């Protein structure tokens, strides 16, 4: 444990094109091997595709998708005696957004479309409509927490 306490939170940059922190975080999640321009092109193309398909602001569509994917509760492993319990705990603030973005990008990569921007666009559109693998992951997480509710008193 560090003696100086937890590291301070760094401010999140605002995206230059959409003026949104969420888009900036999404670019960071798509980023691989430090190729930020490639990640930006993927995200911007996906968001423009969302605009064409829905006819609405893509940032609003992204926020709606994240609200549908963001978990309210998750499970953490806690070792008590010789047994390991899955203890349900509520997800606080930025962790929910981080998990939602991670799941959105992760399940977009697993899709069958040819290019990454198509996959990301379709996953965002599915999530904004309450469909898709990322929304299913959230439901599974909530089910897991519900089934382990008996261990909630082991919370720390």
UniProtKB/Swiss-Prot annotation:
Main function: One of the primary rRNA binding proteins, it binds directly to 16S rRNA where it nucleates assembly of the head domain of the 30S subunit. Is located at the subunit interface close to the decoding center, probably blocks exit of the E-site tRNA.
GO molecular function per UniProt: rRNA binding; structural constituent of ribosome; tRNA binding
Top-level taxon of the source organism: Bacteria
GO biological process, one term: translation
InterPro entries: Ribosomal_uS7, Ribosomal_uS7_bac/org-type, Ribosomal_uS7_CS, Ribosomal_uS7_dom, Ribosomal_uS7_dom_sf
GO cellular component, one term: small ribosomal subunit
Name of the protein in its database record: Small ribosomal subunit protein uS7
SUPFAM superfamilies: Ribosomal protein S7
Subunit organization: Part of the 30S ribosomal subunit. Contacts proteins S9 and S11.
Family in the record: Belongs to the universal ribosomal protein uS7 family.
UniProt entry keywords in alphabetical sequence: Ribonucleoprotein, Ribosomal protein, RNA-binding, rRNA-binding, tRNA-binding
Gene3D superfamilies: Ribosomal protein S7 domain (1.10.455.10)
Pfam families, alphabetized: Ribosomal_S7 (PF00177)
Signal peptide span: none
NCBIfam families (alphabetical): rpsG_bact (TIGR01029)
């Amino acid at each position: 444990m560090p003696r100086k306490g937890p590291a301070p939170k760094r401010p999140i940059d605002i995206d230059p094109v959409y003026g949104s922190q969420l888009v900036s975080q999404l670019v960071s999640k798509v980023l691989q091997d430090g190729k930020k321009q490639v990640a930006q092109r993927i995200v911007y193309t996906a968001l423009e595709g969302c605009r064409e398909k829905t006819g609405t602001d893509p940032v609003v569509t992204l926020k709606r998708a994240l609200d549908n994917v963001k978990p309210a509760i998750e499970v953490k492993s806690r070792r008590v005696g010789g047994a390991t319990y899955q203890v349900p705990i509520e997800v606080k603030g930025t962790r929910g957004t981080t998990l939602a973005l991670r799941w959105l990008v992760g399940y977009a990569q697993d899709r069958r479309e040819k290019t990454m921007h198509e996959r990301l666009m379709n996953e965002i559109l599915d999530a904004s409509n309450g469909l898709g693998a990322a929304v299913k992951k959230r439901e599974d997480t909530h089910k897991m927490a519900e089934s382990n509710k008996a261990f909630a008193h082991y919370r720390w």
